[in-house]
Amino acid sequence: MATLVREADGTARPGERPSSGARVFIAMSGGVDSSVAAARLCDAGYEVVGVTLHLWDYPDDGSVKSRCCAPEDQHDARRVADHLGIPHYTFDRRALFREHVVDPFVEAYLAGETPSPCVACNRSVKLRELFPLAERLGVSWVATGHYARVVLEEGGARLYRGRDRHKDQSYFLHMLRSDELSRLLFPLGDSTKDEVRAEAIARGLPGAEKGESQELCFIPSGRYAPFVADRAADRLRPGPIVDRDGRVVGSHGGVHGFTVGQRKGIGVSLGRPAFVVGLDAASGAVHLGDEGDLYAAGAEIADAVWCDDAVFPLEAEVRVRARHEAAPGIIERRRDPATGAESFVARFASPVRSVSPGQMAVVYRGDRVLGGGRIKAALRSQAAS
């Protein structure tokens, strides 16, 4: 079995694991990853309890399949639990998911932002619920099928990237505190997706060859604009499309239909490549520019969470999107002299493309996650200096 908690070269002491026979909650979606994670926990001798959160409702016409919240996936989670001989429970958290994930998602798009709903779900729904549920049932440990690692160091439990850099999900878990990490197990952290898939097939797990969705679980079509429009039709604000010289070159039905960096589907033709470089929800304007206008020298970071040993200014690497290669930079802490409120600014060593408000800026040093927060604004050279 892969190591559940791994030593980090030079700084970490050997990872402590729950003793054999300890009770462990495993979040089960019915997918390959959580199924293999559950099987590995069973192999390690733990008393494993499967838990599925019912988060979203889908049409009953069979049009939605292989999503982490679809009815058949909940059924698959139970089938896997039966296959492994472990108890399985489903808890209804649809109202919580709507409040903390879906509604903020809609609000963010109306505000011209590109949100990170998977971060909100992990922070405010899944782990927020799993820890109390575990405590209520006398369970000390919680496990998930995320591709990430927890390392026990002198200062406490730390979050590290998963070994599979293509599947690494530490970006979506950056907000976890040390006391939470100390109770988390990531059985897949040292494995690649191909290894996990092969293991699921070899074990004969139900759903072992199930496909993997690249879309949000609550918008399986990937069509975000209609989803937002259906839920906020009376708040959509038409506005102008403006080129880099300030000329109005078209109109649109709402900023919710655009994201920074978008090139296709803008609705106008300028005779040259044009990209969405800014969204102004207050005026309703969509600003276009050349590809070079997409690059930012820095980012203002809000709602930040940092590890307790972070010292500023912090020299590290910053990921501004889940699939973005981390860019070197310096994170500075600023304090408002009037209110005392803290804010943070990331200054990149070289300009970074498509820094989108609403996405997360997650900070790394090597494989270790130091923290991060929501991108409030992309900063041009003069603003980041």
UniProtKB/Swiss-Prot annotation:
Site (Interaction with tRNA): H146, Q359
Record's keyword annotation contains ATP-binding: yes
Disulfide bonds: C121-C217
Binding positions (ATP): A27, M28, S29, G30, G31, V32, D33, S34, L53, G145
Entry's EC annotation: 2.8.1.13
Reaction(s) catalysed (UniProt annotation): S-sulfanyl-L-cysteinyl-[protein] + uridine(34) in tRNA + AH2 + ATP = 2-thiouridine(34) in tRNA + L-cysteinyl-[protein] + A + AMP + diphosphate + H(+)
Top-level lineage group: Bacteria
Chief place where the protein resides: cytoplasm
UniProt region (Interaction with tRNA), positions on chain: 167-169
Keyword Kinase: no
Gene3D superfamilies to which the protein is assigned, alphabetical: Adenine nucleotide alpha hydrolases-like domains, HUPs, Translation factors
Broadest EC class assigned to this enzyme: transferase
Functional note: Catalyzes the 2-thiolation of uridine at the wobble position (U34) of tRNA, leading to the formation of s(2)U34.
HAMAP family given in the database record: tRNA_thiouridyl_MnmA
Annotated family: Belongs to the MnmA/TRMU family.
Protein name in the entry: tRNA-specific 2-thiouridylase MnmA
Organism: Sorangium cellulosum (strain So ce56)
